[in-house]
Amino acid sequence: MAQIEKKVGLLRKSSASKKPLKEKVVLMYDEIFTKEDPTKSNPRFWDELFLMKVNIEYLESKLESLDGEELMKLKDNINSLFQHCIHALRAEHQIRVVNSLQTLCALIRGVHQKNKPTSGFDIINMLMGFDKAELRMKNLMESLDLLLCGDGSESLKSLCLKLLLCLVTVTDNISQNTILEYVMINSIFEAILQILSNPLSRRQHGYDAVVLLALLVNYRKYESVNPYIVKLSIVDDENTLNGMGLVIARALFEYNRQYTDKEEENQTGFFSALTNMVGSMFIADADEKISVQTNEAILLALYEAVHLNRNFITVLAQSHPEMGLVAVPISPIPTTPTSPLGTTPPSSDVISPTELPMDADVQTSNLLITFLKYSSIVMQDTKDEHRLNSGKLCLIILTCIAEDQYANAFLHDDNMNFRVNLHRMPMRHRKKAADKNIPCRPLVCAVLDLMVEFIVTHMMKDFPMDLYTRCIQIVHKVLCYQKKCRVRLHYTWRELWLALINLLKFLMSNETVLLAKHNIFTLTLMVVNLFNMFITYGDTFLPTPSSYDELYYEIIRMHQIFDNLYSMVLRLSTNAGQWKEPASKVTHSLVNIRAIINHFNPKIESYAAVNHISQLSEEQVLEVVRSNYDTLTLKLQDGLDQYERYSEQHKEAAFFKELARSISINVRKNVAFNTLSQEILLKEFSTIS
């Protein structure tokens, strides 16, 4: 019946002899759209309006049906509606506050839809009037601040955050949203922090608060001084920072859990049984169903916290009691085009008060572990632009972490060992690793595992050059810390070396295809210089002398790849062309690797001949290596332990502008979809005293 009434409210004429009855609120909306002052016929018009249940659909559709010129004629009444909405936010009766918040959402969205370049009106003038805009927005922001910080209803606080998200995301490009200038002047930063520092409000509103903060931080961040950036960078309150970390961790964990559930469904269901019978022809389709959109909004919030606030780094490694708690959905969360896996906030709408412990290793978990698991999922599939950007953002966050001295200290801390079960891409030539076999190790081992996994699994013709470059840079920065602090990490370095050698082999094998799109020599030089780092400084950070011997063994064993690489870069560096200079740099960087190969290979051949052995074992080769170090001459190479620090503004501005745009569109869709559960709200506030 309620739906019929809504539809009736949208009808202008009826084919029946009698006109259909309209809701009273619809009749009142019609009065607002008649150019006359509605209080002339009813002095209590505005008081009565906010006692009526809001019909968002009708109000928005009414605004949508008008062209710019018609809307301009109604400016005075729209200004009055906006003004009285703000006034109603201070009302004693909470039902009025609820209705005013919902009306503001509909009004802002509806008017913004008409704000096209051809419409000929200014959004601020249409909603508030130029002369009153500053005062109106000041009053609005103060009222929202009071509601968010007060002891009132949690539903009201939720509505306030929805309204703010609506306000921020009405334009795709948030930096073009002129209303946000007033949100900069009348800051709600402290209200957001208060939500994050309080366990109850954080659990109910933390997700919206964190996403709102991430968006506000990205408003004109390169053009002017953004107060939200300044304030976020200096937050040092432990409860607030931990609260923000918990919200992010919970959202990431929820994504990980949903992914794992879907993965298990695919492995245990009928589909899995069918593919086992007929082979692997359907495997790609199954994986495609699992590899769905990441939650970029929460990822952006994590990035801004890590990038802007050095105090937040401590939160990454901190274990919390709440980290072991996960909210149980009352019903399955729908996965829709506007609400992909992981983007549905773990809000109070879908969470029961009951909370259960996570899996067995949760008690030794933290935000960084949750993020690494999350990254291992989203970095698996980078075939489309959206997934590529998600993987890029994960690597940018890891880059910031790898550059931080304190972060490196806890990453390498032998007293902080964790078992991190990263997700691995299904590949035909390798078995699925058993999670229980993963040992407890310092967290940096999981970071390196993630980098190795990416290197091994993304060698394809549509080569993600940018992601590979970032991946190698992260490994390099970790090695620089180990060299500087003489940290001897017990890690399976051979896996990294083999991954890097196979990457070089891939780049050479696909030289023609890749050179048509990329300068492969920048990446090649970075990979070769990683080997140079190990050769030059490995004795200061490799765990044992035998590890250093194994490095030489792998270089000698795979010498054909290095020989082929040298031939390729020598060919291109001696020919005039665009690759002459970059190829020449790689040629020079190979000097020590070639010296090792040219020094040890004859000695290995001689050893085999003297001992009448056709094929030497690994131990025999290592014996030759150990006994001939003293006659090896290597060239000292400068700058191997230096790197350029990450800079967002100079190199990543375009990426973050586009990312903020994508998030704004997605948040707007989600807010529009479940902005306001009116039945729940009206039930809560049905008693008007």
Curated annotation (Swiss-Prot):
Gene Ontology BP, a term: regulation of Golgi organization
Keywords tagged on the record: Cytoplasm, Golgi apparatus, Membrane, Transmembrane, Transmembrane helix
Species assigned in the record: Xenopus laevis (African clawed frog)
Protein's cellular compartments: Golgi apparatus membrane; Cytoplasm
Function of the molecule: May be involved in Golgi maintenance and protein secretion.
GO cellular component terms given for this protein: cytosol; Golgi membrane
Topological relation to the membrane, as annotated: Single-pass membrane protein
Main location: Golgi
Family: Belongs to the ARMH3 family.
Annotated protein name in UniProt: Armadillo-like helical domain-containing protein 3
KW DNA-binding (keyword) present: no
Entry superkingdom: Eukaryota
InterPro entries given in the database record: ARMD3-like, ARMH3_C
Transmembrane parts of this sequence: 520-538
